[in-house]
Amino acid sequence: MLDKSEAIIEAIDAREILDSRGRPTVEAEVRLESGAVGLAQVPSGASTGSFEAHELRDGDKARYGGNGVLKAVRNAKEKIAPELIGKDALDQTTVDYAMIARDGSDNKSNLGANAILAVSLAAAKAAAAELALPLYRYLGGPLANVLPVPLMNVINGGAHAANNVDFQEFMIVPVGASSFKEALRWGAEVFTALSKVLDSKGLLTGVGDEGGFAPNLGSNEEALEILVDSIKAAGYEPGTQVALALDIAASEFYADGQYTYDGTAHSPAEFIDYLTAMVEKYPIVSIEDGLHEDDWDSWTILTARIGHRVQLVGDDLFVTNKVRLQQGIEKKAGNAVLIKLNQIGTLTETLETIDLATRNGYQSVISHRSGETEDTTIADLAVATRAGQIKTGSLCRSERVAKYNRLLRIEDELGDRAVYAPKVGLGPQF
C-alpha cells in the first residue's frame, strides 16, 4: 500500500515564461518530499468570455505593455505555497479548494486564475509522477482508453487573425478515420491540400494564432466552399470522412441586439435562419458559440431548431463553469460544452463541469487557447475523461502539434486497448 506521506508537497516554485504569442504566462513547479516533480504552464485566450476566471496581469506598461505576470508568480510563491506545503498531492480536491478558499473571490481575481491553475496542474503531475503513472491514467484510471476526434482549426478569422473573416474558426473533423493516427494523417493531408487551393486562388497562406491559414475572403461562406474543395482535393469525401465545424464566436460581433457579419447587421432570428441554412448546405457537424453569451432565449430557439442534427457548443456561454452549464441545461441551450482549464482555474472544477455535462447528456470538447505553450495536459485530459473530442489548433506551430504528438504517444502506449472516439459513439455524432 502506498505510503501517503511520500506524496506530501514539499516546495512550490513559479516563474514568468512566454506563450505562443510572445506574451507572458505562468509556469509552476510542485515538488514532493519523495522528490517527484510536476511542471505546468498555463495558456491565455484572445477571445474571452465575460464570465471567465480572472487572469491576473501586472498592468505595468513599462514591462510587456502591462501584460507581465509577476504578481501572479509572487502569489504562487508567497501565498499559495504556504497554504499547500504539507498537503497531500494525491488529494487534488483538497489542494484545489484550499487555493480557492485562500483566494476568497468569486472569480479568482485576488490570486489570479493563472497562478492557481498552474499550481493545480503541477500538483496533479507531481502526484502522477509519484505513482509512476502517465497523467491520463492517473486522472482517468483503467478506463482511460478513448482517443478524441480532433476538431482542427485550419482557417482562422475573427480575433485569431488579422483578416476580414468574421467567424473565428473553420475546422475539419476526420470523423471517418479508424484511429487517431489515421485521423491526424487525414487532417494533415487536407491542410496541405488547402494550402495549394489557397495558393491557386492567389490568396495568402500566412497563419493565425492557432496555426490555421488567415486569408482575406469575400465572405464566411467562401471559407466553407474552399474547405469542401480541399477535402475533395486530398482524396476524401466531405461529410462521411472529413466533416466541418465552426467556431462562430458570435459575442465578438454582437451589439445592440444585432449580429453584424459580412458587413450587414442581422436580428437574432435572421442569424438563426442563416445558421440553419449553412447546416443544410454544408457538411457541418459542430457549431461553437453560434450566439451571444447572454442571448439565452436565442440559444434555446437555435437548439430546438437544429440541435438534433448538429452539435451546439457553448464556450463563452458556459466558460467551463458548472453554474453557467446548469443554467444551460435548464434552458435547453446547446448540447455540448467547451472545456478550457483556464476559464475556471482549477483541475477539480474542470472535472466537476465535465461530470455535470456527462450526467445531463452534453458532450464535452477539451480545448486549448489561442495563446498556448508546450504544455500537453489537455491531451491527457481528453483521454482521461473519455471526452471524445479535442480542439488544439491546426497542423502547424509546435505548441499545437505538441498536443497531437502527445496523443500519438498515448495511442501507442495503449496499444490494442486504444479506441478512436467515433468508434464508440463519442464525438460529434451527426
From Swiss-Prot:
Subcellular location: Cytoplasm; Secreted; Cell surface
Enzyme class: lyase
UniProt KW keywords: Cytoplasm, Glycolysis, Lyase, Magnesium, Metal-binding, Secreted
Binding residue positions for (2R)-2-phosphoglycerate: Q168, K340, R369, S370, K391
SMART domains in the cross-refs: Enolase_C, Enolase_N
Domain of life: Bacteria
Binding site for Mg(2+): D247, E288, D315
Gene3D superfamilies, A to Z: Enolase-like C-terminal domain, Enolase-like, N-terminal domain
EC number(s) per entry: 4.2.1.11
Similarity-based family: Belongs to the enolase family.
Its biological purpose: Catalyzes the reversible conversion of 2-phosphoglycerate (2-PG) into phosphoenolpyruvate (PEP). It is essential for the degradation of carbohydrates via glycolysis.
Protein name: Enolase
Organism: Picosynechococcus sp. (strain ATCC 27264 / PCC 7002 / PR-6)
Lineage: Bacteria, Bacillati, Cyanobacteriota, Cyanophyceae, Oscillatoriophycideae
Gene from which this protein is expressed: eno
